[in-house]
Amino acid sequence: IEELKQKVKNINIMNEKNTTLNIVPPLHFIITDTSGHTVAVEPHNGLLIVKDNHVKVLTNAPKLEWHIQNLRNYAFLQPEKSTNQLVGKVLVRSMGCEAGTNGLPGGYTSTERFVRATYLRHHLSSSHNEDINLMNCFKILDSVSIPQGAVLDAGETHYTQYQLVMESKDKAYYIKPYFSNQLFKVQLNEELLSKDDMTSVSYTHLRAHE
């Protein structure tokens, strides 16, 4: 991360269409090193700005600072059920063990997805089993992924085309396309890391029921 902070001024963003999305996405970037130090890299006035990201969550809009401030509206969320309250002479009982999550936003805007991802990121159980941790990462992504037809943009379906998790110590990407529940692993070996040009990796497309 320290090396990134020193060299980010030498990085230029290319105005080039993403062949999968067929647009030039207004991307913000989240970067984590092997120590767990996480930063956000966001464009501002033609420059890339590196910001410490202590919640370790990011969406493309608005800026990270706005999302952090917005979390104050959801400070009441908790995994335990809310306590019973005596209102006058009436004991108002909590509705169940899930009641602590009442108010967790359920929409697909970036602001709502940021809150959901932050809540799950900081409350899902961690494990010494890396396979379990990997699956938990995909559970978080499931909660913020947009299904086909749920959101339309000018009549066209706007949906999450793939999910991706990176294992920073192993330097491997795990990818789940929209039409498959199978994970595809791409190992970042020295050959890939030394390439100067964009590299595409193919995979075998499976039918949904497979």
Predicted regions and their residues:
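Conserved small/polar residues in nucleotide/adenosyl-binding loops
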Residues: T204-E210
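Extended, compositionally biased non-globular segments
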Residues: L104-I175
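Long, charge-rich alpha-helical interaction segments
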Residues: Y74-L124
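Acidic, proline/serine/threonine- and glycine-rich low-complexity intrinsically disordered segments
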Residues: S200-S202
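Structured, non-membrane catalytic/scaffold regions adjacent to prosthetic-group chemistry
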Residues: I1-H54
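Phosphate-rich cofactor/ligand-interacting catalytic cores and adjacent structured alpha/beta frameworks
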Residues: T38-E80, T101-L104
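C-terminal soluble interaction/assembly domains
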Residues: A172-D197
